[in-house]
Amino acid sequence: MQQGDGTEAQVTWEDQQNINRFGRLNNRFHELTDEIRLAKEANENLEDAGNELILCDEDVVRFQIGEVFAHMPMDDVEARLEQMKEDAAKKLERLEEEKESILAQMAELKKILYGKFKDAINLEED
């Protein structure tokens, strides 16, 4: 590889490991972005279901369990829905924390790799 001053930068085994690690982190970052989007949609759907349940005036409502709808008392459905909302919020929070951790690791690797290779390496997305 050519650096800006005309000398070749030697890529060591450690450098290659850092480049590979950055690539894996970048892939996981994109996976997390998709997972976060889906988790937010699930949270919105649960919130909408809760709002619809408030408007419902029946004692027994249909509740989806897997592929099937079951008739359940309104109180049980409300309790299950609240638990599902809590679980979804915790999952979203965990995904956001993992995303922040990955961004920090990627920033550290960028600093190391750009410090050695300068303009000879591109770690930015277009």
From Swiss-Prot:
It comes from the Eukaryota. Keywords: Chaperone. GO terms for biological process: protein folding; response to cold. Belongs to the prefoldin subunit beta family. Heterohexamer of two PFD-alpha type and four PFD-beta type subunits. Binds specifically to cytosolic chaperonin (c-CPN) and transfers target proteins to it. Binds to nascent polypeptide chain and promotes folding in an environment in which there are many competing pathways for nonnative proteins. This is Probable prefoldin subunit 4. It comes from Avena fatua.
